[in-house]
């Protein structure tokens, strides 16, 4: 079920910044996105230098479709969970409420990015997973 509050916020951000591309949104919000070696299991995390958030993404995904999901996921932490730090870990058996919320926002961002890129909604969730590298939940 789609949370209409989340959908409204995502649509507002897309309209305000003229895109749903999470990398462009981060840039327009002056949020640095850095690629670094985070090991095999850590896909991304948010760090802060003072009050300034930095999205750290695993360099192993720099040229892969999944870079969009991981960027959108970490961006969601910055926008909707300001001040909290976290990391997207593939092997985590326990997904916190914050991780679940960030994933929901990321998927809403990517549905809209798909519509922006293809002028239509994805026909299936699998189509969205394939295009933007959304990991199986």
For every predicted segment, state its role.
Residues 1-137:
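Active-site hotspot residues in diverse enzymes, especially metal/ion-binding acidic/histidine motifs
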